[in-house]
Design a protein with these regions (language model features):
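Sec-dependent N-terminal signal peptides
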Residues: 3-16
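Short aromatic-glycine-(Arg/Gly/Cys) micro-motifs in beta-strand/loop hairpins
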Residues: 16-18, 271-292
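Acidic Gly/Asp/Thr-rich repetitive segments characteristic of extracellular carbohydrate-active
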Residues: 17-49, 287-320
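Right-handed parallel beta-helix/beta-spiral solenoid domain characteristic of secreted/periplasmic
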Residues: 23, 58-125
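Surface-exposed loop/turn motifs in large extracellular/passenger domains
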Residues: 37-40, 67-69, 91-114, 135, ...
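Acidic glycine-/aspartate-rich tracts in secreted/extracellular proteins
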Residues: 39, 46-47, 63-69, 115-121, ...
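Short glycine/acidic-rich loop motifs that flank beta-strands on beta-rich extracellular proteins
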Residues: 48-54, 70-71, 87-97, 119-126, ...
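Short consensus segments that form the blades of beta-propeller domains
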Residues: 131-135, 168-171, 201-202
Length: 320
């Protein structure tokens, strides 16, 4: 199945041009800017300190696209060594995601990267109140998706959703520590407020399913939707064969703090996911704890947010 997907993807984009990073352009963003719909941007191993935007239909991949990913893909050298690390001190402080995929109902493919250090991008939620309230909130620590429907496979999402602990005024992703997806007219980018913008509104039909299979999630942080947050999308989101920090091994699933669909519009498909098995009894949280602990009374975890990701229906959380 995995080989078939990669071959199909390559055929789909084979009529376009191929741009190689860093041979053709020194940064991924410059390569994307030069690409046209249907082109492929292939990235060599290295650490790329960038905040990237995709607003066109392209295939973005590491050299993992040429590898056999049928078994043991998590140890693939190209995936582990092709890193997109967000930059938090850019000229636009609202933009803190590793990657933003936006507008036009585009459906690019992102394959074979490690995403790290993303703190999310500021979105404005327009409340339908008697007195309108525009609330800015960071979303999509590693990847923020807005009115787009990408395929995201064979990637690692590690340590996204919160800024460095030594940074003054730490920034935390409100929704989607790893990935956030918005398909909602009541949400807009902070930078788009109060200005007219020329956006390509595609007539493409919205797909019934998002393909987010075969990804690895570790130590991402968010107030809601630790690894994936969806708002407005009414289809299914397939995260099958992915690897999470912790799962309920009895139901082979994670809870709705880890994978969150606001108002339960979307359904998460979780076939054959893996992770550490969680205990459904009681969890203890302490300021002196460690999130690598089991959450027992003798070995408490450190943060309530991490405790939420360990919760089963019959779990009690105790703070000390």
């Amino acid at each position: 199945m995995k080989k078939v997907f990669i071959i199909f993807s390559l055929i789909s984009f084979s009529l376009g041009s191929t741009i190689n990073i860093p041979n053709d352009f020194p940064t991924i963003q410059l390569g994307i800017d030069a690409a046209n719909n249907g082109d492929t941007v292939i990235v060599a191993q290295g650490i790329y300190y960038e905040n990237i935007t995709i607003d066109k239909e392209i295939f973005l991949s590491s050299y993992a696209i040429f590898d056999n990913l049928e078994n043991g893909w998590i140890n693939n050298e190209n995936i582990q060594s092709t890193i997109i690390h967000a930059v938090s001190d850019t000229l636009n402080p609202s933009f803190g995601s590793c990657l933003v995929v936006r507008d036009g109902n585009i459906a690019p493919t992102i394959l074979g990267f490690t995403f790290m250090g993303g703190i999310g991008t500021v979105m404005i939620e327009n409340d339908n109140c008697a007195i309108p309230i525009n609330r800015p909130e960071r979303s999509g620590g590693a990847i923020l998706i807005f009115k787009a429907y990408p395929t995201i496979n064979f990637n690692r999402f590690i340590n996204n959703g919160i800024s460095n602990e030594n940074e003054r005024g730490r920034k935390v992703s409100k929704a989607g520590g790893a990935i956030a997806h918005y398909d909602d007219a009541e949400v807009e980018f902070d930078e788009d407020r109060n200005r007219l913008i020329n956006i390509n509104h595609s007539i493409r039909d919205i797909p019934e399913q998002l393909n987010i299979q075969n990804n690895y999630f570790e130590n991402n942080t968010s107030s809601d939707g630790k690894n994936f947050y969806s708002r407005g999308y009414e289809g299914s989101i397939d995260v099958s064969h992915s690897i999470f920090d912790d799962i309920d091994c009895e139901s082979n699933s994670v809870n709705n703090f880890v994978l969150k669909s606001r108002d339960d519009y979307a359904e998460f498909i979780q076939n054959e996911i893996t992770g550490n098995c969680i205990d459904g009894n009681a969890l203890y949280v302490s300021v002196d704890g460690d999130n690598n602990n089991s959450g027992s009374e003798d070995y408490p975890v450190k943060t309530i947010g991490h405790a939420f990701s360990l919760v089963k229906d019959d779990t009690t959380i105790t703070t000390t």
